[in-house]
Amino acid sequence: MLDPIHPGEILVEDFMKPLGLSINQLARDLDVPPNRISAIVNGTRSITADTALRLGTYFSVSPETWLGLQLEYDPRLTRQRAGSEIIRRVRVRPAA
């Protein structure tokens, strides 16, 4: 299975680099602290609804797109890191 792609990587590769945007410039334009954008770009912070709305407005992309990327990433990462352990430990409830 391929490694899940963090939305921050998509932000950098598909939006920031083509437009020549730095972390500081994007943070200023979004009216957020630069460390928020830095953490997203570095894959250590999730995209929240607030950030999704800001990114969506700025790049003319729906906020749901940004949230969808995060919602796709989170379970894939969890499955990769702890999936077999979770499946092994959780008791399945029988169907009624």
Pin down the residues of each PLM region:
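Short, charged recognition helix plus adjacent turn
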Residues: T57, T65-A96
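A short, Lys/Arg-rich alpha-helix, primarily the initiator
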Residues: M1-L21, G68
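Short alpha-helical DNA-recognition segment
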Residues: L21-A39
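Residue-level detection of the helix-turn-helix DNA-binding "recognition helix"
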Residues: D31, N42, L71
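Residues within the alpha-helical elements of helix-turn-helix
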Residues: P18, D29, Y58
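Short, basic-rich loop-to-helix N-cap that marks the start of a DNA-contacting helix
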Residues: T44-T57
